[in-house]
């Protein structure tokens, strides 16, 4: 699940990763999920940062895990790409 808010910081994108204890009881599993989320964002952040650089606002994005299935990098990356493209699409229109 992704939530974002426009901020006054021009062209700045900040991201929050959250994995609730409700879905993953062990800290090892939560940390792995967050690590995969961070890596996926790192590899795909260029799409959102290039779209926001010339705008007069910034974005704060919160990504929260809402599934209790064990994550795979491929699944997380496809969802991450879809989320980032969706945010860009909503802000352009």
PLM regions: where:
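Positively charged, solvent-exposed patches that mediate nucleic-acid binding
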Residues: 1-93
């Amino acid at each position: 699940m992704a939530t974002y808010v426009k901020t006054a910081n021009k062209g700045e994108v900040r991201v929050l990763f959250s994995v609730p204890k409700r879905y993953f009881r062990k800290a090892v599993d939560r940390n792995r999920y967050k690590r995969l989320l961070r890596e996926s964002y790192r590899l795909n952040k260029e799409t959102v940062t290039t779209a926001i650089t010339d705008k007069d606002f910034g974005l704060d994005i919160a990504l929260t895990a809402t599934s209790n299935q064990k994550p795979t990098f491929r699944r997380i990356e496809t969802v991450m790409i879809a989320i980032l493209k969706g945010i860009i699409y909503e802000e352009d229109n």
